[in-house]
Design a protein with these regions (language model features):
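Non-catalytic substrate-recognition and accessory regions of acyl/acetyltransferase enzymes
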Residues: 1-134, 142, 149-159, 167-169, ...
Length: 209
């Protein structure tokens, strides 16, 4: 399989400088190795510190139990499922998996095909909710941009849908997605969609950064 690689730029939070990165339209073994050998130890250290401080489980990172090896294995070889990864400084900085079989719920585009963003996660050291400044900023936005671009390529005109973990709700509102409320059929997670117009505005904003 040929992997398309695009050059993108992230922000080094400590220095304010741009960092060159790769946006890859696949999740390969190298990314899974990074998840296992780098993400997991970093996450474990965070969880141990949260436990030591007596932080309630409800405030722990809500994706801590995600297993990317299992997620990718489950859809391997299925053309309707795609993966994306962001690599910088020889490390995987973020991962995303999308599903091309879903349809829109937003009243203005109900029933039309969209790209469903099944999972999106940035490396533990890039998260905002760990009580320390992230190393790199822009990873999540880059993965959303990739999903919107795929939607456009597939003829879905940028339409995007997803269920958000509560800790990420504010991020999806910030990038202009429509909050369609809690979904009782999906663990009461809030369901967000990006319309054609919102996708255009989002991409224009990313290009101007």
């Amino acid at each position: 399989m040929t992997v398309d690689v695009s050059t993108i730029y992230l922000l080094d939070v400590a220095t304010g400088e741009s960092v060159e990165a790769e946006l890859r339209d696949a999740i390969e073994q190298a990314q899974l190795d990074d998840w296992q050998t780098k993400w997991q130890p970093a996450l474990l250290a965070v969880l141990q510190e949260l436990a030591r401080k007596g932080v309630p489980l409800s405030q722990w990172p809500q994706s801590w139990h995600w297993n990317w090896a299992q997620k990718t294995a489950k859809v391997q070889g299925l053309l309707a499922f795609r993966g994306f990864s962001v690599v910088a400084r020889r490390e995987t900085q973020g991962l995303a998996q999308v599903d091309l079989t879903k349809a829109s719920r937003e009243p203005g585009q109900a029933g039309k095909p969209l790209v469903y963003l099944d999972y999106l996660e940035v490396a533990p050291w890039n998260r905002l909710d760990f009580g320390v400044a992230p190393r790199l900023r822009g990873v999540g936005s880059a993965l959303v941009t990739a999903a919107v671009a795929l939607s456009d390529e597939e003829g879905f005109k940028g339409r995007l849908g997803l269920h958000s973990l509560p800790q990420a709700d504010a991020f999806y509102r910030k990038i202009g997605m429509t909050d369609l409320g809690q979904d009782p059929a999906y663990q009461n997670l809030r369901y967000f969609e990006m319309t054609v117009e919102q996708a255009r505005t989002f991409l224009e904003g990313e290009q101007d950064r």
